[in-house]
Design a protein with these regions (language model features):
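PLP-dependent amino-acid enzyme catalytic core
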Residues: 1-296
Length: 296
Protein backbone atom coordinates (compact mmCIF):
# COMPACT_ATOMS: atom_id res chain seq x y z
CA UNK A 1 0.00 0.00 0.00
CA UNK A 2 1.29 3.43 -0.93
CA UNK A 3 0.60 6.12 1.66
CA UNK A 4 -0.06 9.68 0.54
CA UNK A 5 1.76 12.84 1.59
CA UNK A 6 0.30 16.24 2.41
CA UNK A 7 0.89 17.53 -1.13
CA UNK A 8 -1.61 14.96 -2.39
CA UNK A 9 -4.41 16.64 -0.47
CA UNK A 10 -4.13 20.09 -2.02
CA UNK A 11 -7.19 20.59 -4.21
CA UNK A 12 -10.28 18.44 -4.82
CA UNK A 13 -12.18 20.66 -2.39
CA UNK A 14 -15.94 20.30 -1.78
CA UNK A 15 -18.54 22.18 -3.79
CA UNK A 16 -21.72 22.67 -1.74
CA UNK A 17 -25.13 24.12 -2.51
CA UNK A 18 -26.45 26.94 -0.35
CA UNK A 19 -29.73 25.84 1.25
CA UNK A 20 -31.00 28.90 3.11
CA UNK A 21 -29.30 31.87 1.45
CA UNK A 22 -30.70 32.29 -2.04
CA UNK A 23 -32.25 34.78 -4.41
CA UNK A 24 -34.92 32.48 -5.82
CA UNK A 25 -35.57 32.58 -9.58
CA UNK A 26 -34.69 28.86 -9.90
CA UNK A 27 -30.99 29.55 -9.48
CA UNK A 28 -28.45 27.27 -7.82
CA UNK A 29 -25.72 28.97 -5.78
CA UNK A 30 -22.66 26.85 -5.00
CA UNK A 31 -19.73 27.50 -2.66
CA UNK A 32 -16.29 26.05 -3.46
CA UNK A 33 -14.81 25.40 0.00
CA UNK A 34 -11.12 26.19 -0.45
CA UNK A 35 -10.61 26.42 3.30
CA UNK A 36 -10.51 22.61 3.21
CA UNK A 37 -7.00 22.70 1.74
CA UNK A 38 -4.22 21.64 4.17
CA UNK A 39 -3.05 25.19 5.00
CA UNK A 40 -6.60 26.48 4.91
CA UNK A 41 -7.01 28.50 1.72
CA UNK A 42 -7.22 28.60 -2.06
CA UNK A 43 -3.58 29.78 -2.04
CA UNK A 44 -2.35 26.27 -1.25
CA UNK A 45 -2.81 25.51 -4.94
CA UNK A 46 -0.51 28.19 -6.44
CA UNK A 47 1.98 28.00 -3.56
CA UNK A 48 2.63 24.31 -4.14
CA UNK A 49 2.56 24.82 -7.91
CA UNK A 50 5.17 27.59 -7.79
CA UNK A 51 7.51 25.71 -5.45
CA UNK A 52 7.35 22.32 -7.16
CA UNK A 53 7.62 23.69 -10.70
CA UNK A 54 10.56 25.90 -9.69
CA UNK A 55 12.22 22.80 -8.24
CA UNK A 56 11.57 20.82 -11.41
CA UNK A 57 13.24 23.55 -13.48
CA UNK A 58 16.25 23.64 -11.16
CA UNK A 59 15.60 27.22 -10.13
CA UNK A 60 15.41 26.38 -6.41
CA UNK A 61 16.49 23.49 -4.22
CA UNK A 62 15.86 22.54 -0.57
CA UNK A 63 17.97 24.70 1.72
CA UNK A 64 17.44 27.88 -0.32
CA UNK A 65 15.79 30.98 1.12
CA UNK A 66 12.51 32.07 -0.44
CA UNK A 67 11.08 35.59 -0.13
CA UNK A 68 7.51 36.64 -0.87
CA UNK A 69 5.33 39.70 -0.35
CA UNK A 70 1.94 38.65 0.95
CA UNK A 71 -1.21 39.92 2.60
CA UNK A 72 -1.75 36.60 4.30
CA UNK A 73 -2.99 33.44 2.62
CA UNK A 74 -0.22 33.02 0.05
CA UNK A 75 2.30 33.55 2.82
CA UNK A 76 0.71 30.87 4.97
CA UNK A 77 0.56 28.45 2.05
CA UNK A 78 4.18 29.12 1.06
CA UNK A 79 5.28 28.74 4.69
CA UNK A 80 3.60 25.32 4.73
CA UNK A 81 5.22 24.34 1.41
CA UNK A 82 8.62 25.56 2.63
CA UNK A 83 8.28 23.50 5.81
CA UNK A 84 7.31 20.41 3.83
CA UNK A 85 10.11 20.69 1.30
CA UNK A 86 12.99 22.13 3.31
CA UNK A 87 13.25 25.86 2.56
CA UNK A 88 13.78 28.93 4.70
CA UNK A 89 10.85 31.33 4.18
CA UNK A 90 10.86 35.12 4.59
CA UNK A 91 7.47 36.80 4.26
CA UNK A 92 7.01 40.56 3.84
CA UNK A 93 3.57 41.84 4.77
CA UNK A 94 1.70 44.93 6.00
CA UNK A 95 1.57 45.13 9.78
CA UNK A 96 -2.21 45.52 9.86
CA UNK A 97 -2.88 41.94 8.78
CA UNK A 98 -4.67 39.83 11.38
CA UNK A 99 -2.69 38.39 14.27
CA UNK A 100 -3.98 34.91 13.39
CA UNK A 101 -2.30 35.10 9.99
CA UNK A 102 1.01 36.20 11.49
CA UNK A 103 0.91 33.49 14.14
CA UNK A 104 0.15 30.81 11.56
CA UNK A 105 3.09 31.85 9.37
CA UNK A 106 5.44 31.78 12.33
CA UNK A 107 4.06 28.39 13.39
CA UNK A 108 5.27 27.01 10.05
CA UNK A 109 8.73 28.47 10.75
CA UNK A 110 8.56 31.53 8.51
CA UNK A 111 10.38 34.78 9.31
CA UNK A 112 8.15 37.86 9.06
CA UNK A 113 9.17 41.33 7.90
CA UNK A 114 6.35 43.76 8.70
CA UNK A 115 5.94 47.03 6.81
CA UNK A 116 3.83 50.06 7.82
CA UNK A 117 0.18 49.58 7.01
CA UNK A 118 0.20 52.95 5.26
CA UNK A 119 2.53 51.47 2.63
CA UNK A 120 0.28 48.49 2.00
CA UNK A 121 1.10 45.63 -0.32
CA UNK A 122 2.85 48.01 -2.71
CA UNK A 123 5.54 48.68 -0.10
CA UNK A 124 5.72 44.99 0.82
CA UNK A 125 6.40 44.11 -2.82
CA UNK A 126 9.05 46.82 -3.13
CA UNK A 127 10.86 45.63 0.02
CA UNK A 128 10.74 41.99 -1.06
CA UNK A 129 12.34 42.95 -4.38
CA UNK A 130 15.00 44.99 -2.56
CA UNK A 131 15.84 41.99 -0.37
CA UNK A 132 16.13 39.81 -3.47
CA UNK A 133 18.41 42.36 -5.13
CA UNK A 134 20.61 42.30 -2.02
CA UNK A 135 21.03 38.55 -2.47
CA UNK A 136 18.99 37.53 0.56
CA UNK A 137 16.82 35.01 -1.26
CA UNK A 138 14.71 34.05 -4.27
CA UNK A 139 11.28 35.51 -5.03
CA UNK A 140 8.72 33.17 -6.57
CA UNK A 141 6.53 36.26 -7.26
CA UNK A 142 2.89 35.25 -7.13
CA UNK A 143 2.00 38.47 -9.00
CA UNK A 144 3.98 37.62 -12.15
CA UNK A 145 4.56 33.87 -11.98
CA UNK A 146 2.51 31.94 -14.58
CA UNK A 147 2.66 28.89 -12.30
CA UNK A 148 0.09 30.70 -10.14
CA UNK A 149 -2.82 30.67 -12.63
CA UNK A 150 -1.68 27.32 -14.05
CA UNK A 151 -2.56 25.76 -10.69
CA UNK A 152 -6.17 26.82 -11.24
CA UNK A 153 -6.19 25.98 -14.95
CA UNK A 154 -5.13 22.43 -14.07
CA UNK A 155 -7.02 22.14 -10.77
CA UNK A 156 -9.84 24.51 -9.84
CA UNK A 157 -11.30 24.85 -13.34
CA UNK A 158 -11.48 21.11 -14.13
CA UNK A 159 -12.89 20.40 -10.67
CA UNK A 160 -15.72 22.89 -11.14
CA UNK A 161 -16.54 21.57 -14.59
CA UNK A 162 -16.69 18.02 -13.25
CA UNK A 163 -18.52 18.89 -10.01
CA UNK A 164 -21.26 20.80 -11.87
CA UNK A 165 -21.40 18.27 -14.71
CA UNK A 166 -20.65 21.15 -17.07
CA UNK A 167 -23.74 23.10 -15.94
CA UNK A 168 -21.90 26.08 -14.43
CA UNK A 169 -23.14 29.37 -15.90
CA UNK A 170 -21.35 31.93 -13.68
CA UNK A 171 -18.04 31.89 -11.81
CA UNK A 172 -17.52 34.51 -9.09
CA UNK A 173 -14.15 35.19 -7.46
CA UNK A 174 -12.59 37.94 -5.40
CA UNK A 175 -9.49 39.43 -7.03
CA UNK A 176 -6.16 39.83 -5.25
CA UNK A 177 -3.22 38.48 -7.21
CA UNK A 178 -5.90 37.39 -9.74
CA UNK A 179 -4.39 33.92 -10.15
CA UNK A 180 -7.62 32.13 -9.19
CA UNK A 181 -9.83 33.97 -11.64
CA UNK A 182 -7.25 33.95 -14.47
CA UNK A 183 -6.57 30.21 -14.45
CA UNK A 184 -10.14 29.14 -13.76
CA UNK A 185 -11.51 31.48 -16.43
CA UNK A 186 -9.10 30.15 -19.01
CA UNK A 187 -10.21 26.55 -18.43
CA UNK A 188 -13.94 27.21 -18.19
CA UNK A 189 -14.01 29.42 -21.28
CA UNK A 190 -12.29 26.66 -23.26
CA UNK A 191 -15.14 24.35 -22.28
CA UNK A 192 -17.96 26.86 -22.72
CA UNK A 193 -17.32 30.45 -23.88
CA UNK A 194 -20.76 31.49 -22.59
CA UNK A 195 -19.82 31.01 -18.93
CA UNK A 196 -19.80 34.44 -17.28
CA UNK A 197 -16.64 35.20 -15.28
CA UNK A 198 -17.19 37.77 -12.53
CA UNK A 199 -14.40 39.50 -10.61
CA UNK A 200 -15.03 41.20 -7.26
CA UNK A 201 -13.33 44.48 -6.39
CA UNK A 202 -13.67 46.63 -3.25
CA UNK A 203 -15.72 49.79 -3.38
CA UNK A 204 -13.78 53.03 -3.08
CA UNK A 205 -12.73 53.45 0.54
CA UNK A 206 -13.46 49.84 1.52
CA UNK A 207 -10.75 47.65 3.02
CA UNK A 208 -11.45 43.94 2.52
CA UNK A 209 -8.64 41.42 3.21
CA UNK A 210 -7.90 39.45 0.05
CA UNK A 211 -9.68 41.80 -2.39
CA UNK A 212 -7.69 44.55 -4.10
CA UNK A 213 -8.00 47.15 -6.80
CA UNK A 214 -4.37 47.69 -7.74
CA UNK A 215 -2.79 50.95 -8.94
CA UNK A 216 -1.82 50.54 -12.58
CA UNK A 217 1.90 50.39 -11.75
CA UNK A 218 1.35 47.41 -9.44
CA UNK A 219 -1.24 45.51 -11.48
CA UNK A 220 -0.26 41.81 -11.38
CA UNK A 221 1.51 40.77 -14.57
CA UNK A 222 -0.52 37.56 -14.67
CA UNK A 223 -3.74 39.60 -14.99
CA UNK A 224 -5.42 39.56 -18.41
CA UNK A 225 -8.44 41.84 -18.44
CA UNK A 226 -10.30 40.04 -21.28
CA UNK A 227 -10.58 36.91 -19.13
CA UNK A 228 -13.09 38.69 -16.86
CA UNK A 229 -16.56 39.42 -18.26
CA UNK A 230 -17.87 41.53 -15.38
CA UNK A 231 -16.26 43.55 -12.61
CA UNK A 232 -18.50 43.98 -9.57
CA UNK A 233 -17.73 46.17 -6.59
CA UNK A 234 -18.58 45.28 -3.00
CA UNK A 235 -18.47 47.32 0.18
CA UNK A 236 -16.68 46.27 3.35
CA UNK A 237 -19.99 46.34 5.24
CA UNK A 238 -21.72 44.06 2.73
CA UNK A 239 -18.76 41.66 2.66
CA UNK A 240 -18.70 41.41 6.45
CA UNK A 241 -22.46 40.97 6.73
CA UNK A 242 -22.45 38.13 4.18
CA UNK A 243 -19.52 36.53 6.00
CA UNK A 244 -21.63 36.43 9.17
CA UNK A 245 -24.66 35.15 7.26
CA UNK A 246 -22.68 32.29 5.76
CA UNK A 247 -21.73 31.14 9.25
CA UNK A 248 -25.15 31.61 10.86
CA UNK A 249 -27.41 30.47 8.03
CA UNK A 250 -25.30 27.93 6.13
CA UNK A 251 -22.72 26.74 8.66
CA UNK A 252 -19.92 27.93 6.35
CA UNK A 253 -17.18 29.55 8.44
CA UNK A 254 -15.53 31.75 5.83
CA UNK A 255 -13.21 34.73 5.55
CA UNK A 256 -14.25 38.25 4.62
CA UNK A 257 -13.26 38.14 0.94
CA UNK A 258 -15.48 35.06 0.60
CA UNK A 259 -18.35 37.07 2.02
CA UNK A 260 -17.67 39.74 -0.57
CA UNK A 261 -17.71 37.25 -3.43
CA UNK A 262 -20.88 35.59 -2.14
CA UNK A 263 -22.60 38.98 -1.84
CA UNK A 264 -21.85 39.52 -5.53
CA UNK A 265 -23.07 35.99 -6.35
CA UNK A 266 -26.41 36.82 -4.68
CA UNK A 267 -26.56 40.09 -6.60
CA UNK A 268 -26.14 38.21 -9.87
CA UNK A 269 -28.69 35.60 -8.80
CA UNK A 270 -31.27 38.37 -8.37
CA UNK A 271 -30.75 39.38 -12.01
CA UNK A 272 -30.81 36.01 -13.83
CA UNK A 273 -32.87 32.82 -13.94
CA UNK A 274 -32.07 29.10 -14.09
CA UNK A 275 -28.38 29.75 -13.46
CA UNK A 276 -25.70 27.68 -11.73
CA UNK A 277 -23.52 30.22 -9.93
CA UNK A 278 -20.26 29.15 -8.29
CA UNK A 279 -18.53 31.41 -5.77
CA UNK A 280 -15.07 30.76 -4.36
CA UNK A 281 -14.88 30.55 -0.57
CA UNK A 282 -11.20 31.42 -0.32
CA UNK A 283 -10.42 30.55 3.28
CA UNK A 284 -11.79 29.99 6.79
CA UNK A 285 -13.14 32.44 9.32
CA UNK A 286 -10.71 31.48 12.08
CA UNK A 287 -8.12 33.77 10.43
CA UNK A 288 -10.32 36.79 11.14
CA UNK A 289 -11.52 36.28 14.72
CA UNK A 290 -9.43 39.20 15.99
CA UNK A 291 -10.78 41.60 13.35
CA UNK A 292 -14.20 41.98 14.97
CA UNK A 293 -16.13 40.67 11.98
CA UNK A 294 -17.66 38.00 14.22
CA UNK A 295 -19.29 38.87 17.56
CA UNK A 296 -17.18 38.15 20.64
Amino acid sequence: MEFRTLEDYVGRTPLVRLKRINAGRNNVILAKLEGNNPAGSVKDRPALSMVMRAEARGRIKPGDTLIEATSGNTGIALAMAAAMRGYRMILVMPENQSVERRQTMRAFGAELVLVPSSGGMEMARDIAEKMRDEGRGIILDQFANPDNPVAHYEGTGPELWEQTDGRITHFVSSMGTTGTIMGTSRFLKERNPDICIVGCEPEEGSSIPGIRKWPEAYLPKIFERPRVDRFERVSQADAEEMTRRLAREEGIFAGISSGGAMHVALRIASQVENAVIVSIVCDRGDRYLSTGVFPA
